[in-house]
């Protein structure tokens, strides 16, 4: 902290520092020490929810709590305040004749934002509010800056994202959303563990970006003098573990993609990838539905959920539609018919579908049609399956129609929530697709991947038929907490 910082102190900050010094002069550490609580606000409210004022008086139960001072009122020899802990707020009632003059001075001089420990008797006020009638106050930590004026919630969005700690202090809805996020992740783990999956950890630093179509962040390893990338997916390492015989694995972790930011994209985000030996994409559809419904039930109950005013029937079986059928239903264009790339591009031109210069196959055009016409119609949970080989370099070809793959994506409210497929375990085919990706990269596709020869070698040792899945955790949390921007579910979103 610089000298300039102290020169800019306002009156409130100066007064708080003076109070800090006064505490030290009294032999009280302004920043406290270990303090043992017997309960938090939530436990007390639950335990005494049905107890009247008279019943509590007769019980004369005591409790020791601690938390941040959020409100304070009163004068003379009596004061009321609210202490906030992780579970919420609880009122304290402080009388000078109960705590003593010295102890009452600690309470009286405490500022909003300070941390206090309170011992006392559980009571209910005449207004019916559960409270602690203090018998002793302990100063635990001095806040040298005042809380934002409107401590019931910050209104400056920039401050909310840059100073999340202030948002958590002042906005209970935001605080609870992040508690819900944690619960969702815990429940996903619980579900997969119950299905016999093993949670593993794989490298964040990769020699070659792979497992997804995305632009990576590039860094340099000084000791080895080599360029490396932050992972854009965990897929290829997890499938190496399937080769190694682990059979059922998953990883929840951060993924990094050097791309644009919008309401549903952040450069670093959390995903889960799951791989199951001896399964295909149909099995993984069932698994995906189970994971998402289990997470939804754990935080929203077992009925439909409401997202931005729309009822989402997340509790019912998810719809399953082939990509070509979905396109045909909306546009009338039938990509089941054999056609040349030229014929496909002519259809795209007729329907005003934008095409990229690296598109070289009919499959690219089919995917462009889907993105242009179908995605925006997928409100209820829908599995779209049968993606073209051209846009699915790691998925196994469909044995009945090798133009398409045994792959699916889950869409809800027009957004993709999961991507999965029967994994490609033919090393010769895999190398060929990597080479096609490398060619697309040369033609200007920044998201195309290079060739991971080590992964191809791993496949040559044999990988059993396998189904794999990736789910974006952040988007799922957005859905289940009814928010519209990813920044509201990331504790510390990327900012300029």
Swiss-Prot record:
InterPro entries: Aa-tRNA-synt_II, aa-tRNA-synth_II, aa-tRNA-synth_II/BPL/LPL, Lys-tRNA-ligase_II, Lys-tRNA-ligase_II_N, Lys-tRNA-synth_II_C, NA-bd_OB-fold, NA-bd_OB_tRNA. Keywords: Aminoacyl-tRNA synthetase, ATP-binding, Cytoplasm, Ligase, Magnesium, Metal-binding, Nucleotide-binding, Protein biosynthesis. PROSITE patterns: AA_TRNA_LIGASE_II (PS50862). Gene3D superfamilies: Bira Bifunctional Protein, Domain 2, Nucleic acid-binding proteins. Its main location: cytoplasm. The keyword Ligase applies. It is found in: Cytoplasm. The keyword ATP-binding applies. Mg(2+) 1 binds at residues 409, 416. GO terms for cellular component: cytosol. Mg(2+) 2 binds at residue 416. Binds 3 Mg(2+) ions per subunit. GO terms for biological process: lysyl-tRNA aminoacylation. GO terms for molecular function: ATP binding; catalytic activity, acting on a protein; lysine-tRNA ligase activity; magnesium ion binding; transferase activity; tRNA binding. It catalyses: tRNA(Lys) + L-lysine + ATP = L-lysyl-tRNA(Lys) + AMP + diphosphate. Its EC number is 6.1.1.6. Its cofactor is Mg(2+). Homodimer. Belongs to the class-II aminoacyl-tRNA synthetase family. NCBIfam families: lysS_bact (TIGR00499), PRK00484.1 (NF001756). This is Lysine--tRNA ligase. It comes from Streptococcus gordonii (strain Challis / ATCC 35105 / BCRC 15272 / CH1 / DL1 / V288). The lineage of its organism: Bacteria, Bacillati, Bacillota, Bacilli, Lactobacillales. The gene is lysS.
